[in-house]
UniProtKB/Swiss-Prot annotation:
Name of the gene this protein is made from: NRG1
Biased composition (Basic residues): 504-514
Record field: compositional bias (Polar residues): 315-324, 460-474
UniProt similarity note: Belongs to the neuregulin family.
Single GO cellular component term: plasma membrane
Membrane side Cytoplasmic: residue ranges: 230-602
Pfam families the UniProt entry points to: I-set (PF07679), Neuregulin (PF02158)
Keyword Cell division: no
Biased composition (Low complexity): 294-314, 325-341, 527-536
CDD domains listed in its UniProt record: EGF, Ig_Pro_neuregulin-1
Name of protein: Pro-neuregulin-1, membrane-bound isoform
Alphabetical keyword list: Cell membrane, Disulfide bond, EGF-like domain, Glycoprotein, Growth factor, Immunoglobulin domain, Membrane, Secreted, Transmembrane, Transmembrane helix
Sugar attachment sites: 21, 113, 126
Annotated GO biological process: brain development; cardiac muscle cell myoblast differentiation; cell differentiation; endocardial cell differentiation; ERBB signaling pathway; ERBB2-ERBB3 signaling pathway; ERBB2-ERBB4 signaling pathway; ERBB4 signaling pathway
Length: 602
């Protein structure tokens, strides 16, 4: 059999790449040495720190004179580019004397650290030196020589073997000079300070301007608010005034549409009542009375003011018997008053009565009855008993005068006055400003007279168709116009208050009078209008007869004619168709009145 033999195996001893990497990973990094360099001022200098092998995650640091150079403290002309894997460089641009010194490079990794140093000398070309061949290096000054540099400069000593050592100063950025004695940034800061001051002043000015504008706007706003409030108040007042004026105009328009408004309109009927204003309140039970109306024509009306007014009814009876004439004049005064002064102090006035030719109301008795209950307010009335008795005293001319026939030959049976001789005299009544208008007047007749009127009416019906009286009738007497007379009153019986105003307006009203006789008129004060008698008893009639003796004694026949005359007057007014009657009717009426009338009557 054939056998083979193989020689021994041989292994290569050369290390592989993996072995190298593994060995690098276990050995700490090592740097190459740097060379010292010397350059002139203003030249560029580059220092390079390199490792002998390539290590991952290496960190390089540069130090100058034992201090690490960082971005904060490095000079402007010194720059450190980005590190590479195996080396790091330091570039010095435009080198200065301050750049001279000892630079060191340090590398570190996880396995260990390593460092290397190099000296840099910066030479000044202007300085003369007698140095010969040799080298010089820069070292820090000793402690005693550090005072050579001022303002924080660093002192270095250049050692040159053939020459004596010299000192160099490395100055901060704001200083310069051989010993750092010159302050470079002084002018810069000065200029910057001026700018700062100007900027501050400008800022203050701006702040003041803005503040002033804000204050002005605030003041204007306050003024606007005040003005608005004032105008609002004024506008409200104007609206109130306009509203009031519109309301008044609306009321005026409504009043005009409703007709003219008169506070005291003239009455259509002049109501002649015996009115007495009492201080006490008259109960409504006494006020309910009948009212009958008759109309009388008045000559004219003077005013609408509620002053006193006097109406005098003067029926005159004239008759003639051949060559003799007799006159029977009867005055019956009806007093009408509506006093404003008394109405201020009293309660509602008394009832008002109306009268026609047949009957009359009973208001007079209620007034007289109420007048007796209030003697204080009636005591000073011009219609009181004392005043009437003084007015009718025979010593003075009496306003109510009765005359007997002038001829005694005329018997009472022949005294039948014709209808044409019966007239009424009514002076001016203060009622209305309209003139020459006719208004119905109202007379108040006591209840006793109404009873006698009824009796007289029965007798009048019996004598109406009697032919025996036709031959004895009297012809009408001639008429003539005369003026009324005014009667005087004594000064002592005038009221103490304001004197009454005459209502005739100083005019004398002319009336038609039969046979030339004059009618009488009585003016009475307007403050109160009531009569003194308060009841219908005989004692009151007798007392009135004692106070006025001449009324009951002078001519009883004339007083008995008063009811008949009043009745005839009312009948003629209410029934114009019977205004003209035969003399027989008048004589029958007269005789019946004489037979039935009491001798005492007022």
């Amino acid at each position: 059999m054939w056998a083979t033999s193989e020689g021994p195996l041989q292994y290569s001893l050369a290390p592989t790449q993996t072995d190298v990497n593994s060995s690098y990973n276990t050995v700490p990094p090592k740097l190459k040495e740097m060379k010292n360099q010397e350059v002139a001022v203003g030249q560029k200098l580059v220092l390079r720190c390199e490792t002998t092998s390539e290590y991952p995650a290496l960190r390089f640091k540069w130090l100058k004179n034992g201090k690490e150079i960082t971005k904060k403290n490095r000079p402007e002309n010194v720059k450190i580019p980005k590190k590479q894997k195996k080396y790091s460089e330091l570039h010095i641009y435009r080198a200065t004397l301050a750049d001279a010194g000892e630079y060191a490079c340090r590398v570190s990794s996880k396995l260990g650290n390593d460092s290397t140093k190099a000296s840099v000398i910066i030479t000044d070309t202007n300085a003369t030196s007698t140095s010969t061949t040799g080298t010089s290096h820069l070292t820090k000054c000793d402690i005693k020589q550090k005072a050579f540099c001022v303002n924080g400069g660093e002192c270095y000593m250049v050692k040159d073997l053939p020459n004596p050592p010299r000192y160099l100063c490395r100055c901060p950025n704001e200083f310069t000079g051989d010993r750092c004695q010159n302050y470079v940034m002084a002018s810069f800061y000065k200029h910057l300070g001026i700018e700062f001051m100007e900027a501050e002043e400008l800022y203050q000015k701006r702040v003041l301007t803005i503040t002033g504008i804000c204050i002005a706007l605030l003041v204007v706003g306050i003024m606007c608010v005040v003005a608005y409030c004032k105008t609002k108040k004024q506008r409200k007042k104007l609206h109130d005034r306009l509203r009031q004026s519109l309301r008044s105009e609306r009321n005026n328009v409504m009043n005009m549409a409703n007709g003219p408004h008169h506070p005291n309109p003239p009455p259509d009927n002049v109501q002649l009542v015996n009115q007495y204003v009492s201080k006490n309140i008259i109960s409504s039970e006494r006020v309910v009375e009948r009212e009958t109306e008759t109309s009388f024509s008045t000559s004219h009306y003077t005013s609408t003011t509620h002053h006193s007014m006097t109406v005098t009814q003067t029926p005159s009876h004239s008759w003639s018997n051949g060559h003799t004439e007799s006159i029977l004049s009867e005055s019956h005064s009806v007093l009408v008053s509506s006093s404003v002064e008394n109405s201020r102090h009293t309660s509602p006035t008394g009832p008002r009565g109306r009268l026609n030719g047949i009957g009359g109301p009973r208001e007079g008795n209620s007034f007289l009855r109420h007048a007796r209950e209030t003697p204080d307010s009636y005591r000073d009335s011009p219609h009181s008993e004392r005043y009437v008795s003084a007015m009718t005293t025979p010593a003075r001319m009496s306003p109510v005068d009765f005359h007997t026939p002038t001829s005694p030959k005329s018997p009472p049976s022949e005294m039948s006055p014709p209808v044409s001789s019966l007239t009424i005299s009514i002076p001016s009544v203060a009622v209305s400003p309209f003139m020459d208008e006719e208004r119905p007047l109202l007379l108040v007749t006591p209840p006793r007279l109404r009873e006698k009127y009824d009796n007289h009416l029965q007798q009048f019906n019996s004598f109406h168709n009697n032919p025996t009286h036709e031959s004895n009738s009297l012809p009408p007497s001639p008429l003539r116009i005369v003026e009324d007379e005014e009667y005087e009153t004594t000064q002592e019986y005038e009221p103490a208050q304001e004197p009454p105003k005459k209502l005739t307006n100083s005019r004398r009203v002319k009336r038609t009078k039969p046979n030339g006789h004059i009618s009488s008129r009585v003016e009475v004060d307007s403050d109160t209008s009531s009569q003194s008698t308060s009841s219908e008893s005989e004692t009151e009639d007798e007392r009135i007869g004692e106070d006025t003796p001449f009324l009951s004694i002078q001519n009883p026949m004339a007083t008995s004619l008063e009811p008949a005359a009043a009745y005839r007057l009312a009948e003629n007014r209410t029934n114009p168709a019977n205004r003209f009657s035969t003399p027989e009717e008048l004589q029958a009426r007269l005789s019946s009145v004489i037979a039935n009338q009491d001798p005492i009557a007022v």
